[in-house]
Amino acid sequence: MDLVKGAAKVARAMVACMAMLACMGIVPAHAQRVDPDIRVLRALLEKAEPEIDLARAKLVIDQLIDPTIDIEGTLAKLDVMAAAVRASAGPRAKSSEIAQVLRSYLYDAGPWNNRQPFRFDLEGDPLGHKIAGKLLTNYLATKKGNCVSMPTLFVLLAQRLGLEATFAASPNHYFVKYRDETGRWYNLETTSGGHPRRDESYQRDTPMTPQALKNGIYMRPLSKKESVATVMVDVLLDHYKDAGKPEKVIAIADLALEHYPSDIDAMLDKGYAYYLLIRDFQNKYPMPRDIPPEERQRFRALERNNRLWYEKAEALGWREPDAGADARYMEMLKSVKSN
């Protein structure tokens, strides 16, 4: 009986100790309650590359933002779209011919789409700031997209058609990388009808450092796992930034970086999350001298982490956009849309 009481006392002490450590942020990951979103994302990211279904991954992540999303129904809709492209291309079509039919199916007006093609939302949300505009189901419903939703649909359909297509990034922008039957890679700009664009064009319109190119954070085709970690998870990170949940942002960014260590978006989101925590601290204590002694260590840790993650991004070649970056980006989008 004394042993049972002793064990119970030890257990209570351990629980109290773990609670204290949790408050300090140093509880081992396995000892903490696993956040449901983290559990879902980890299951996706721990799949072997050939087992990753990008369409399902996208919808599972989007459903964390909008629980009303019908995953199976949307997958069935994608299958119907892919079947229509395959039938139009014919049984003996080469990869490049199927890609051209897919491009026309999505972006040219015709009876196959009731003369309502998918188009870039130049007037409504051209910079892709609205979370809803990045959800696949919203894009399918409205046919108005941005540089997240538009390449996403193209890649998901291309992969269902057996084409070698994936995502690539330039600063604040995603596009499609496609390799044809000859082994040649093309950049396809879905915001302007899926037409090819040269590397030099992206490097001119969305400037990137030689260091960034050397480190592969821009312009290269992403693996499926990298695509999930950055293109798809980044929408969830934006959702939690908008919701004012920086701790959640940090936890999700950590998971993304675990599987894609060069994920610039996750680094920047993590740095921004620490800024939000610093801002909350400063709202509570307007002057540094107002911070109680027992909380100063945490405040300094927040400042260090805020600097750390921006410095990590800069070390890979990322640079802070200047004041005119958004205006130049808009001009680029208008230019490619008119070509």
Locate each region found by the language model.
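Bacterial N-terminal signal peptides
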Residues: A13-G25
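A structural boundary/capping signal
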Residues: H30-N339
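N-terminal secretory signal peptides that target proteins for export/translocation
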Residues: M1-V10
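Acidic/proline-rich low-complexity IDRs
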Residues: D2, A19-M20, V40
